Amino acid sequence: MKHAIKHIHFVGVGGVGMSGIAEILLNLGYTISGSDLADSATLQRLASLGIQTYVGHEAAHVAGADAVVTSTAVQADNPEVLSAREKHIPVVPRAVMLAELMRLKTGIAIAGTHGKTTTTSLVASVLAEAGLDPTFVIGGRLNSAGVNARLGQGDYIVVEADESDASFLNLSPVMAVVTNIDADHMETYGHDFGRLKQAFVDFLHRMPFYGTAILCTDDPAVRDIVPQVTCPISSYGFEEGAELRAVNVRAVDGQMHFTVQRRNGVVLPDLDVVLNLAGRHNVLNALSAIAVAVELNIADAVVQKALAGFKGVGRRFQRYGEVRAQDGGTFTLIDDYGHHPVEMAATLAAARGAFPGRRLVLAFQPHRFTRTRDCFEDFIKVIAQADAVLLAEVYGAGEAPIVAADGRTLARALRVAGRIEPVFVDDIAAMPQAIADNARDGDVVLCMGAGSIGAVPAKVLEMLQISELIPQGGRGL
């Protein structure tokens, strides 16, 4: 071909979704370059693989590129995007490039407002344990592999399908999971929940006639769309009527034990499962992975081994270890990406189940002013479930501040509600010291949020002596 694509440049390559696709394309033999606004561990890792990386955006960075990939976070007036268009270099949205990768293999896409990253990781881990060597692109670092993306030699590719910008409508998988449908990123859908549900229907209809929809029918909005889904459905959940149903669910030493009853088309024997994750919400995530395994005829023993040995995902209830408290004892430090009230409630419940009877200290940084405004009352209810709260200012993620949707107003509302007396931390740089000052012997300190609070746990470890470090790697993919 006259215009064969050999060199692909990524604008915003430091993002978790962009970096994974860049790495896979590199392993497919393409020349890859990329830029990001700030240096990061991700940029340094990509550079170590042989990718030309740049800090900052300049028109010269696209020189020699045959295609330029952008994420939705990249503005249309970005100098690299403008230069590419001026030179008639194709500018490709990230989701379109992901769709092109999926065309090379049999695609399994994980959609839903909450739980996508963990579920994608569980599915990839089950396929890997079965020897299927999947390709995967995940929105977080899979601890067992140490990466968020990998090019496998097998027939399957497992990816997250992102509804936040409706980009999942570019994908055409042959199997699709929908974990739940909740009101988030509603600006994409004109603040119309009906449009959001219809987008999920449209996503499922992008599968071929032989595709399978794996749906969590515990979720009311998912149940609402079932009559509109035209392809075969495999349902899962806790409630009666689900074809894969978890019963006898219990928390044991930070793990979840449960039994799966399987009635999807054929009656399969009950399956006893030990899941190396905390929380009932993760039981649902595991059920979807089990449903995928049933569709692919993966042996039960393989599924049980994969779930029992699952090493977790970075920033998803990630235990950093036992840290020395200033009063001479120790506290448990946990990091989590949760930033929506529904996610936070599930994670707080998981912490209660994993550490019964212990004081729970929540260090939370709200993410986006629009979400803080739209979910204000729900945030008050869920934050008050902790025993002590360290509340940071909102991480704007590029949004302009909104009156009465900031961290200080949220802290004031919590005080007025009389449920808890939060400590307001105006500068996130002061959060590690705030944790050190407030954590006591026996506490569980949970850092939560999708913004810059992700760097806080490591800084806490730098400040305070570690009593017992939890290993973050292990055998697996």
UniProtKB/Swiss-Prot annotation:
Binding positions (ATP): 112-118
Class of enzymatic activity (EC top level): ligase
Annotated compartments: Cytoplasm
Listed GO biological process terms: cell division; cell wall organization; peptidoglycan biosynthetic process; regulation of cell shape
Keywords: ATP-binding, Cell cycle, Cell division, Cell shape, Cell wall biogenesis/degradation, Cytoplasm, Ligase, Nucleotide-binding, Peptidoglycan synthesis
GO cellular component: cytoplasm
One GO molecular-function entry: UDP-N-acetylmuramate-L-alanine ligase activity
Pfam families: Mur_ligase (PF01225), Mur_ligase_C (PF02875), Mur_ligase_M (PF08245)
Entry keyword Cell cycle: yes
Keyword Protein biosynthesis on entry: no
Family listed: Belongs to the MurCDEF family.
Protein name: UDP-N-acetylmuramate--L-alanine ligase
Taxonomic source organism: Albidiferax ferrireducens (strain ATCC BAA-621 / DSM 15236 / T118)
Lineage: Bacteria, Pseudomonadati, Pseudomonadota, Betaproteobacteria, Burkholderiales
Gene that encodes the chain: murC
